[in-house]
Amino acid sequence: MESKGRIHPSHHHMRRPLPGPGGCIAHPETFGNHGAIPPSAAQGVYPSFNMLPPPEVMEQKFVAQHGELQRLAIENQRLGGTHGSLRQELAAAQHEIQMLHAQIGSMKSEREQRMMGLAEKVAKMETELQKSEAVKLEMQQARAEARSLVVAREELMSKVHQLTQELQKSRSDVQQIPALMSELENLRQEYQQCRATYDYEKKFYNDHLESLQAMEKNYMTMAREVEKLQAQLMNNANSDRRAGGPYGNNINAEIDASGHQSGNGYYEDAFGPQGYIPQPVAGNATGPNSVVGAAQYPYQGVTQPGYFPQRPGYNFPRGPPGSYDPTTRLPTGPYGAPFPPGPSNNTPYAGTHGNPSRR
């Protein structure tokens, strides 16, 4: 770069004159291994002509030097072209630098103007910010109120959901009201029917209880009379055995075979032939009765409550044949419907159906 613009000396000026007469060049190959010039040559004492190299060698050296000089010239030309292009690039770069300096100045001025405008805006915004402190407080209060309103809205939505569910349940209940009313009316009618049935059965039970009490009294009187007749029959039988009449053996055999006494009883016309009544046991002639009270019984079977001996022509709970039939008094029940079956007449009056305390 520093040598650019200078004129380089040509290779003709760079040649050195040949020392000594004749202008011959002393080649270093002829002077030892290191190429040093001998001191005799340095002192101006030149070798003889016989010591000079041959002309072919000199010509080859000249050709080599000429090629080197041409190469250097070509390189110099290339360097000159490169130097010119670099000078052009330098001029363009300097022009660009000048333009950049101008742009930087304009940008600095614009930046200063912008900064001044921004400073003015910041000052205005600071004044407005100071004025907007009250607005900020109001905004905070409004946000708090909005949050509270959102919470209240959520609560109201949950309440509305609950009320909607309750309304749906109420609607379903309201839809069931006609069925419930009809069921209530049916239950009311059934209650009235059951009440009428209960009153009717109660009246029937009271009448039946009174008839049973009267039959019990009659039975007690009959039992006493049967006891008397039994005693008389036993006395007659004993007297016949003692007498040993002609028909005593046949009578006793008939009694033993059938288990019944021959002859007609006192109540045979009304109740049929009486069954065999065992002899009363001493100390066991009384038995409790839950309806009538304590009464005298002539035989052991009636000492237990609810015990009634089977007889061919008389049923104690039902009474004598044709005397009393409670079913004839109940053709129909309440409202014209068939009356439900009552307690069995074969059940003792002191049993489950005949006990007033269990009703």
From Swiss-Prot:
UniProt function note: Has no transcriptional activation activity.
GO CC annotation terms, alphabetical: nuclear body
Name of the protein this chain belongs to: Protein FLX-like 2
Biased composition (Basic residues): 1-16
Single GO biological process annotation from the record: flower development
Keywords assigned by UniProt, alphabetized: Coiled coil, Developmental protein, Differentiation, Flowering
Family the UniProt entry places it in: Belongs to the FLX family.
Annotated region described as Disordered, given as residue ranges: 1-27, 303-359
Highest taxon listed in the record's lineage: Eukaryota
Disulfide bonds: none
Species this chain originates from: Arabidopsis thaliana
Phenotype caused by lack of the gene: No suppression of FRI activity.
Encoding gene per record: FLXL2
Subunit structure: Interacts with FRI.
Coiled-coil annotated spans: 83-236
Keyword Coiled coil: yes
